[in-house]
């Protein structure tokens, strides 16, 4: 066809003629040059030695990667393996910080000063101190007990007068907790306290015979008598008073069986307006009156429509009935004794000596034997948390610089983006499922290193507004400081009923040494102690970090976005399926040549069934690693004679996560099967170690890799007159939702250790 003046070719020639075309040869785009310098720091030298000690080069990675990286490792005993594991001894670090700390004499006392003083007071007051009886009496007065003990049976007061002065503890706990129906508000919750030292209801469970039981009770009665004598040497009937306290404690403790046996009944955990609740308590117990007086101590006026929940109402009512029919002097004696027991472990002085004598004579210790300084740390930080936040502040300042938190977040951001890209750029999921998966990924919260308030001294000081700071001195007996701190914590929690401030769960604070996904709050947690020192080394190869820690974080993030009851296109998984079912069908099954179908033909096949989160962990971590070295335009390599390039180090770090005792809970056999199978499906691994192309052993002629679609169940028509049943079911479902069982169903929590640098 000839181009005419009015034809399309004519206009094309005119257009080309009008363009300025540069015919000079184009310069090639300069590639970003990545530097891979050798890391000569001590940490890298130790890591290089570890790999040379544990990698077995007589077994090729292509034949058996697990044996290649774990054969030598697995032969080590637990002590030998522990030197390669990342372990932070928080207790040792805290002892060092608190023992060597100094306090500025002229400056205003801060929260961190208080934990230093309290710790040193505890260590110092292990022995005797002056005016011990007066110190203990003042402690009891602080809890509303003006005189202890009293003669039973001579009371001129009723039980309400006693409880109005002392509060409900140690009979009942009154706590401020989050409202289940409204996660941003607080409410009141009442439950049985049961602070008993002896196993009154479970002697047999502790392997205690009847003969030994009587010996323990005799020694316990003597302990009470000795404490009475310490406070009131001239008090008559000490033995009788001690016996009455012990017998009442035993009878009250036996009510705990109602809790352990979970006595069933209608409305066991009612939630009502506090003024109405008395109608459902024993003899219309005036709980509104008593709690109103208690909350006045923090300037809160309880309203009659304040909601309160009673946990196990039958148990609580049994305790209230016992209170109402008991002599008020005996009630006060019991309450005073329980309070003394609360402080006796670290009381020091003669009180501590009497406690030791009891344990020696009874040959029974209610708790694990510990050094004195360990008991002091427990009382302030690790068991009780009255001084957790200031201690954490000191630890973070010394051992966890902000750069570690920043680098950890950077790693996570790379992994999250890699996973988001994987979700969005696929052809095996429906668009609505993609959107839901991405939304779920974006909703995950991260607590990395520490919560910011731990490094805010102004905020930390507000946590101790009810402490008489002038009385917190090295000369103050620890039992006095301890009681002030406990009382302060109690009052601050009461105050939160009005402020709606959420109680911090210190179990997952900076001292938490494990990586953890909390399904209840949809939060991935890697606190300071779990990653301390890992990101602080400037030259530590990123291939090592991302292959090990990065793979574990990638696994846990992939697990967080798995969710039940989402259907995907061409899903071959019966029943409820995970959001990743389509991914598994497209990738996992395709790579394994329709493993589901093949397994139906070969039921004896031992190929491990691997969930997508495990399958994709190393892939996501590697993509994140690539982004990390782009960010820094390079990485470091290890020193040594053995040549280990960056890609190989990544897979070595990942592979050794599967070694014995290195973190995963699989058996050696399971770990070997899983790791080898995963690596055979990883094309980059195969290329890195020059392995031959993998052909699945179950591949057979005729397999067409057809995914069998899920058969939908027919919906049953509801029967007539089922309104009452449906209402009951609705109530049960509501309870299930409130107890967050849905989150538990899709949690599959795994706690993973970190291999040491």
Residue ranges and their predicted role:
Residues 54-75, 203, 207-229, 431, ...:
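Hydrophobic/aromatic-rich, well-ordered segments within soluble, folded domains that form packed cores
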Residues 23-92, 757:
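Signal-peptide-cleavage-adjacent N-terminal segments of secreted and extracellular proteins
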Residues 55-62, 83, 87, 91, ...:
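Solvent-exposed, acidic/flexible segments
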Residues 73-77, 197-199, 534:
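Short, solvent-exposed loop/turn elements at domain surfaces
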Residues 33-35, 245, 251, 271-283, ...:
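Intrinsically disordered, low-complexity linker/terminal regions across diverse proteins
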Residues 93-415, 451-454, 463, 467-475:
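Noncatalytic, helix-rich "gating/capping" subdomain that lines the substrate-entry/channel surface
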Residues 5-20:
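Cleavable N-terminal signal peptides of Sec/SRP-targeted secreted and luminal proteins
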Residues 57-61, 181, 516-520:
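Extracellular/periplasmic catalytic domains that process cell-envelope and extracellular macromolecules
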């Amino acid at each position: 066809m000839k181009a005419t003046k009015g034809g399309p070719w004519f206009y094309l020639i005119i257009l080309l003629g009008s363009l300025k075309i540069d015919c000079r040869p184009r310069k090639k785009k300069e590639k970003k040059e990545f530097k891979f310098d050798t890391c000569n720091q001590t940490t890298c030298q130790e890591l290089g030695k570890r790999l040379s000690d544990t990698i077995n080069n007589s077994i090729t990675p292509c034949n058996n990667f697990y044996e290649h990286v774990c054969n030598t490792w697995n032969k080590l005993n637990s002590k030998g393996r522990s030197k390669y594991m990342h372990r932070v001894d928080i207790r040792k670090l805290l002892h060092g910080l608190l023992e060597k700390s100094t306090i500025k004499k002229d400056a205003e006392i801060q929260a961190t000063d208080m934990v230093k003083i309290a710790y040193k007071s505890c260590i110092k007051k292990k022995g005797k101190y002056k005016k011990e009886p007066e110190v203990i009496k003042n402690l009891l007065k602080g809890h509303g007990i003006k005189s202890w003990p009293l003669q039973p049976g001579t009371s001129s007061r009723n039980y309400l007068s006693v409880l109005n002065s002392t509060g409900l503890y140690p009979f009942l706990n009154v706590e401020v907790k989050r409202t289940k129906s409204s996660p941003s508000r607080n409410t009141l919750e009442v439950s049985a306290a049961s602070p008993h030292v002896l196993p009154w209801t479970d002697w047999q469970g502790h392997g205690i015979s009847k003969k030994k039981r009587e010996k323990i009770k005799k020694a316990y009665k003597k302990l009470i008598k000795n404490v009475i004598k310490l406070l009131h040497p001239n008090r008559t009937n000490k033995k009788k008073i001690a016996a009455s306290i012990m017998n009442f404690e035993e009878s009250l403790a036996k009510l705990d069986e109602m809790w352990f046996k979970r006595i069933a009944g209608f409305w066991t955990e009612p939630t009502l307006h506090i003024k109405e609740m008395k109608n459902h308590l024993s003899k219309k117990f005036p709980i509104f009156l008593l709690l109103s007086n208690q909350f006045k101590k923090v300037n809160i006026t309880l309203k009659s429509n304040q909601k309160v929940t009673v946990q196990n109402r039958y148990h609580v009512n049994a305790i209230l009935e016992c209170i109402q029919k008991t002599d008020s002097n005996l009630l006060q004696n019991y309450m005073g004794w329980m309070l003394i027991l609360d402080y006796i472990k670290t009381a020091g002085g003669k009180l501590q000596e009497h406690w030791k004598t009891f344990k020696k004579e009874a040959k029974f210790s209610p708790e694990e034997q510990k050094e004195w300084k360990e008991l002091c740390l427990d009382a302030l930080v690790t068991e009780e948390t009255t001084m957790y936040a200031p201690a954490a502040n000191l630890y973070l300042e010394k051992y966890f610089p902000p750069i570690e938190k920043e680098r950890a977040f950077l790693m996570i951001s790379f992994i999250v983006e890699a996973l988001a890209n994987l979700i969005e750029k696929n052809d095996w999921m429906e668009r609505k499922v993609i959107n839901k998966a991405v939304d779920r990924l974006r909703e995950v919260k991260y607590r990395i290193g520490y919560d910011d308030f731990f490094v805010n001294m102004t905020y930390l000081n507000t946590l101790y507004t009810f402490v008489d700071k002038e009385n917190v001195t090295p000369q103050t007996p620890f039992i006095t400081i301890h009681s002030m701190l406990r009382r302060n914590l109690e009052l601050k929690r009461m105050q939160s009923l009005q402020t709606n401030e959420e109680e911090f769960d210190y179990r997952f604070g900076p001292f938490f040494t494990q990586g953890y996904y909390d399904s209840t709050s949809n939060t991935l947690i890697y606190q300071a102690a779990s990653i301390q020192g890992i990101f602080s080394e400037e030259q530590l190869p990123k291939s090592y970090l991302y292959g090990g820690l990065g793979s574990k974080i990638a696994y846990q993030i992939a697990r967080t976005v798995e969710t039940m009851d989402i259907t995907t296109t061409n899903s071959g998984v019966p029943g409820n399926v995970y959001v990743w079912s389509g991914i598994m069908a497209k990738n996992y099954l395709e790579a394994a040549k329709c493993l589901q179908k093949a397994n139906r033909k070969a039921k004896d096949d031992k190929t491990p069934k691997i969930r997508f989160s495990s399958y994709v962990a190393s892939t996501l971590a590697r993509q994140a690693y690539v982004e990390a070295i782009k960010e820094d335009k390079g990485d470091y390599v290890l020193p040594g004679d053995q040549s280990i390039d960056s890609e190989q180090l990544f897979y070595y770090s990942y592979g050794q996560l599967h070694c014995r005792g290195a973190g995963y809970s699989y058996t050696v056999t399971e770990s070997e099967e899983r790791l080898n199978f995963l690596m055979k499906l990883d094309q980059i691994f195969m290329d890195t170690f020059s392995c031959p192309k993998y052909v699945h052993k179950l591949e057979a002629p005729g397999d067409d890799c057809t995914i069998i679609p899920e058969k939908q169940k027919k919906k049953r028509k509801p029967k007539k007159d089922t309104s009452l049943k449906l209402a009951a079911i609705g109530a049960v479902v509501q309870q299930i939702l409130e107890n967050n069982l849905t989150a538990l169903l899709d949690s599959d929590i795994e706690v993973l250790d970190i291999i040491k640098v």
